[in-house]
């Protein structure tokens, strides 16, 4: 019995290097696929509020400080960002970390918001040498996991078409989609979401931008209203750290441009680690 156990242990030890090399080989092949996939699209930076049509691989953490018309301020830690990964050619998956919402003045009902994920499929793209454009489809769904009233009461599906076009150092990135609740329409309401970002690159790593974030509401408490935020901002990056690993950060300020606006004057901070 002891000899059999010893033999199994020795066999396992002999297999460990093989498994390790296999794992390293898998990771290396996967990262090579990611590099090739990203080389076939424009190399713009991801905007602050608009979801980029590019396929990106990074971990992202944002913070927003929202001021409501009532005078209450809300600190949003995370802003439904998280892990962005490219598992297959032309595909990206975003696994968001539920945001943590803090209401000021102090509230006993601070808590986590809804969890969501987003899948991108890149339909067509050309890098800077082959047209400098991209077209991507999104499928996003959020789940009512929020604590207290920090989320909505039903899952919300958001199909979206994203697009982008570059002209030398200037680019436009945009999305057009709709938020479709699977229930409680009278409370949650449906939305049309249209976002556009104008971006300019200076010295390769400095990206000033202006975003236009438009929402129109059907049903729900905001039925018939339209909302537009204009968001000037600046993103800096990508700063190499080691091999594929790099660092990007940016900030901006959302300003309501319509008479209807539940919140206004919203600072944004964004931190990203592309890999």
Regions inferred by a protein language model and the residue ranges of each:
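Transmembrane beta-barrel domains of Gram-negative outer membranes and organellar outer membranes
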Residues: 22-275
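Cleavable N-terminal export/targeting peptides
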Residues: 1-31
């Amino acid at each position: 019995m002891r000899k059999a156990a010893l033999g199994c242990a020795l066999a396992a030890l002999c297999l460990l290097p093989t498994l390790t090399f296999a794992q390293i080989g898998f990771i290396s092949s996967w990262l090579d696929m990611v590099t090739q996939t990203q080389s076939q699209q424009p190399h713009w930076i991801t905007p602050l509020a608009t979801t980029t049509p590019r396929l990106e691989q990074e971990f992202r953490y944002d913070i927003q400080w929202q001021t409501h018309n009532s005078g209450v301020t809300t600190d949003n830690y995370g802003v439904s960002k998280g892990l962005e990964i490219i598992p297959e050619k032309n595909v990206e998956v975003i696994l968001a970390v539920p945001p943590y919402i803090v209401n000021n003045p102090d509230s006993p009902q601070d808590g986590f918001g809804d969890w969501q994920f987003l899948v991108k499929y890149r339909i067509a793209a050309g890098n800077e040498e082959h047209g400098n454009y991209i077209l991507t489809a999104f499928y996003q769904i959020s789940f009512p996991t929020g604590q207290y009233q920090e989320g909505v009461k039903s899952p919300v599906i958001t199909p979206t078409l994203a697009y982008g076009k570059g002209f030398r150092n200037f680019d436009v990135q945009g999305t057009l989609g709709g938020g479709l609740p699977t229930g409680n329409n009278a409370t949650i309401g449906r939305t049309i979401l249209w976002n556009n970002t104008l971006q300019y690159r200076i010295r390769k790593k400095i990206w000033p931008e202006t975003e236009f974030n438009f929402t129109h509401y059907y049903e729900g408490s905001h039925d018939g209203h339209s909302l537009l935020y204009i968001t000037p901002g600046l993103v800096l990056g990508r700063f190499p750290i080691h091999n594929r690993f790099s660092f990007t950060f940016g900030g901006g300020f959302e300003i309501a441009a319509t008479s209807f606006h539940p919140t206004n004057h919203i600072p944004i901070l964004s931190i990203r680690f592309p890999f």
